[in-house]
């Protein structure tokens, strides 16, 4: 498969297994296995004890390390905890995730029998060291941050296309193409960006997607490790945890099926408005356009 960035990746599960670390022992019982989603990071806990949020973190890690687009793994099919995940057969993984199912199954089996409670667990088979992303504190804190919940009475996000179908095509074909994006009725109705207020301060609780993204960037203490500035002066930013951002947005919109693929397609509606721009050749990198308000330092 040829990725958007021009690299080549083989989804043969034999080529994507992790290097052989020490086997799981009774020591995993000393890891934090709390039933809540503050139960530690997923790579510190035996998969049997993962919460559904740690399952999603594991899926996000596979997306990042294999340079796959978010639509390749339908997160809504894995709204389950680790015990349920570990009980799934290869056939069930394939039904849930299509072509990527075999990769998920093989990786999980490797973690179950060869994992360890360690943060420096991963190494690819292509002589590239893959470091597990760390956040301080864990980004899962954002799921329970009641002080940063947006109002949910401003419409619902349009569900766009079947991500599983798109992913099968992406993995099986040697070239990647983007599906056409339909015009969103909600975006057609969206009003022009508000004029700068007299106090020169932006609205801290944005109601549109681009404002939601902006406010995450402007409140890193409340939302650590999700998105970061690449070039603040130019308005360039990068998604660090794309699926976590999508799930947080879905929670605000009462849409449990939200994925980064759907979120990124919704972001495209702002291109014509010159509110957001895609940075060519850089995965997960965007910038604010000339009509975006409230992100510049001199506006705060």
UniProtKB/Swiss-Prot annotation:
Signal peptide: none annotated. SUPFAM superfamilies: SAM/Pointed domain, Winged helix' DNA-binding domain. Residues 207-289 bind DNA. Keywords: DNA-binding, Nucleus, Transcription, Transcription regulation. It is found in: Nucleus. GO terms for biological process: cell differentiation; epithelial cell differentiation; positive regulation of transcription by RNA polymerase II; regulation of transcription by RNA polymerase II. InterPro entries: EHF_SAM_Pointed_dom, Ets_dom, ETS_fam, Pointed_dom, SAM/pointed_sf, WH-like_DNA-bd_sf, WH_DNA-bd_sf. Expressed exclusively in tissues with a high content of epithelial cells. Highly expressed in salivary gland, mammary gland, prostate, and lung. Weakly expressed in kidney and colon. Not detected in heart, brain, placenta, liver, skeletal muscle, spleen, thymus, testis, ovary, small intestine or peripheral blood leukocytes. GO terms for cellular component: chromatin; Golgi apparatus; nucleoplasm; nucleus. Residues 29-115 form the PNT domain. Induction: By IL1B/interleukin-1 beta and TNF in bronchial smooth muscle cells and fibroblasts. By IL10/interleukin-10 and IFNG/IFN-gamma in monocyte-derived dendritic cells. Residues 183-202 are annotated as: Disordered. Residues 185-195 have a biased composition (Basic and acidic residues). One of its GO terms (molecular function) is DNA binding. Transcriptional activator that may play a role in regulating epithelial cell differentiation and proliferation. May act as a repressor for a specific subset of ETS/AP-1-responsive genes and as a modulator of the nuclear response to mitogen-activated protein kinase signaling cascades. Binds to DNA sequences containing the consensus nucleotide core sequence GGAA. Involved in regulation of TNFRSF10B/DR5 expression through Ets-binding sequences on the TNFRSF10B/DR5 promoter. May contribute to development and carcinogenesis by acting as a tumor suppressor gene or anti-oncogene. Belongs to the ETS family. The PNT domain acts as a transcriptional activator. This is ETS homologous factor. It comes from Homo sapiens. The gene is EHF.
